[in-house]
Structure formats: C-alpha cells, structure tokens
Amino acid sequence: MPSSAHLQDAPPLLSRTLTQDEEQTSLRQSSSCGLSAASASESLSGSTKSRIPHSKMLQGNLPRIISPESPAKLPCCYGVIMVLSVAVVALSVALSVKKTPQILTVKTYAACPRNWIGVGNKCYYFNETPSNWTFSQTLCKAQEAELARFDTEEELNFLKRHKGSSGYWIGLHRESSSQPWKWTDNTAYNNLVPIGGDEKHGFLSDNGFSSGRGYIVRKSICSKPNSYTSQCQ
C-alpha cells in the first residue's frame, strides 16, 4: 500500500505529464499547420501555373472576330475620303477667288471728231486741200494728229477704198533711197506692203503705195488714235 508521501507527490508528475502531452500536441499542430500551408502554397502555385498556359491556350483558340464585309468596305471608305478632300479644296479655292476683287479692263473707243472716220483704234481725216508733204504734216498737227499711218490690214484696206482717184500724202518718209521707211514719229515701218520708187516721201496712189518728191502738192490723210481704256470693278 503506498505511502501518503508518495500520494502527495503524484500531482506534480501528472502535471508534468500533461505538459509534455501538450507540447507534443502543439508540435503536431504546428507540423500539421506547416504541412497545410505548404500544401496550400503548392496548390496555389500549381493552380497559377496551370492557369497561365490555359489562358494562353484560350487566347490561341479564340477566333478572330472580323466582319467579312470589312475588306470590301475599305476601298469605298478611301474613295469617300478622297472625294470629300477634293470637295473641301475646291470650296476653299472658290471662296478665295470670290473674296479677291476682280478688276476688268475693258478697251473702248471714243467717238471720232466730226468729219473723221473711225477704223479700229484710229480716226482718219481726208484733207482735200492740196499741199506739199511738209505743210500737210503741219495741217495734221494743227488738229492734234499726224500724216496717216496704218498698222493693220483693216486700216490699209480702208485707206484704199476711201482715197478715190487722187493721190494722198501719208506719214512715211526716209533719209535716202537706201534707208528704211519711218513714220512721222520715227518708228519703223513694218513693211506691210512695199513702197515703190526711190524718193523720200510716201503717198497713196491708184497703183498702191509709192514714193514722191516732198515739194509736190497733193491731198493728204491725217490720223490720230482714239482708244482709251477704262477699268470697271
């Protein structure tokens, strides 16, 4: 039969035994928690790894959603854009032209004085008073004109039609038979028609244009410009 002293020492032993059991239980729980955490980590890692290739596989397997009408509509869209661009440029040009003031120059002819005949841009006067070439030029200058000159076929034909049967002094002259013909303002004659003879002064005769001596008296023809320009905006 155990002694009372032995019975009194039992509780400490029991207490120690319980303490060891608790430590073992705690160690088992810690080990279990560690294994659980490791398993969870590996499971999560594996799940993540398995998701990555799966998502890539899904991306590779996803069909491209493109409308079959898109390629056909692209040229049409480009055409519309080009037409609109051209229209915008044309409208811009039209507006700029519209804003720019337009000045129109119109060439008109004034009425010739009384007894003068207008042809083209000149007025002609047939002086029926015979005189030499030099004095005939003086008479023309008194009327702010010169002995007649012609620069076009129209003017030439007019003079031929209206001269009648008489000879008329005109504005051609030269220094000698070897020199070129000039008008009274010393501008060169364009040789529209040849001038016959070897004299220094020209006149209009029945045979066309000829040269004669300046002191011989003849009728004369005067001419002066009648053109002016006016600007209308």
Swiss-Prot record:
A Pfam family the protein falls into: Lectin_C
SMART domains: CLECT
Keyword set, alphabetical order: Cell membrane, Glycoprotein, Lectin, Membrane, Receptor, Signal-anchor, Transmembrane, Transmembrane helix
GO cellular component: external side of plasma membrane
Origin superkingdom: Eukaryota
Cytoplasmic-side positions: 1-76
Topology of the protein relative to the lipid bilayer: Single-pass type II membrane protein
Name the UniProt record assigns to this protein: C-type lectin domain family 2 member D2
Species assigned in the record: Rattus norvegicus
